[in-house]
Amino acid sequence: MNPLRKKRLLIILAILVGVGIAVGLALSALKENINLFYTPTQIANGEAPLDTRIRAGGMVQAGSLQRSADSLDVKFVVTDFNKSVTITYRGILPDLFREGQGIVALGKLNADGVVVADEVLAKHDEKYMPPEVTKALKDSGQSAPTPAKEG
């Protein structure tokens, strides 16, 4: 083989190996950062993976909020009006967090079926509902409760 062709072949192979490594690293990073959404029904039915970061959302069940007296630990139940799941969280809840309103919690599902959240997101006004929560409520035959009008 001609030395010039051999050099070109080695350069092309090196580029292909580099591109392959870059694509592999990018796919690996994407896989680790994907947080799939699960409804309380899917979590209760065992469809959500254990010890993997997920998003769980629904309506905060009225009367379910429990705050620890001596720490920032919070426990509440989220429902899609079909099934419910308990969520625990350590931290300050968003100002807009209310019972009877939609939330999305990011965290890991433990073996007890409890989502241990490290982030809780509350809807930002009375009309907004995360798309996944809206779909889950629609699928369960329910609709989001409408807030009482002031006046």
From Swiss-Prot:
GO terms for molecular function: heme binding; metal ion binding. The chain crosses the membrane at residues 9-29. Residues 30-151 are periplasmic. Keywords: Cell inner membrane, Cell membrane, Cytochrome c-type biogenesis, Heme, Iron, Membrane, Metal-binding, Signal-anchor, Transmembrane, Transmembrane helix. Heme binds at H124, Y128. Pfam families: CcmE. SUPFAM superfamilies: Heme chaperone CcmE. Residues 1-8 are cytoplasmic. Residues 131-151 are annotated as: Disordered. It is found in: Cell inner membrane. InterPro entries: CcmE, CcmE-like_sf, NA-bd_OB-fold. One of its GO terms (cellular component) is plasma membrane. Its main location: membrane. It comes from the Bacteria. GO terms for biological process: cytochrome complex assembly. It is a single-pass type II membrane protein. PANTHER family: CYTOCHROME C-TYPE BIOGENESIS PROTEIN CCME HOMOLOG, MITOCHONDRIAL. Belongs to the CcmE/CycJ family. Heme chaperone required for the biogenesis of c-type cytochromes. Transiently binds heme delivered by CcmC and transfers the heme to apo-cytochromes in a process facilitated by CcmF and CcmH. This is Cytochrome c-type biogenesis protein CcmE. It comes from Pseudomonas fluorescens (strain ATCC BAA-477 / NRRL B-23932 / Pf-5). The gene is ccmE.
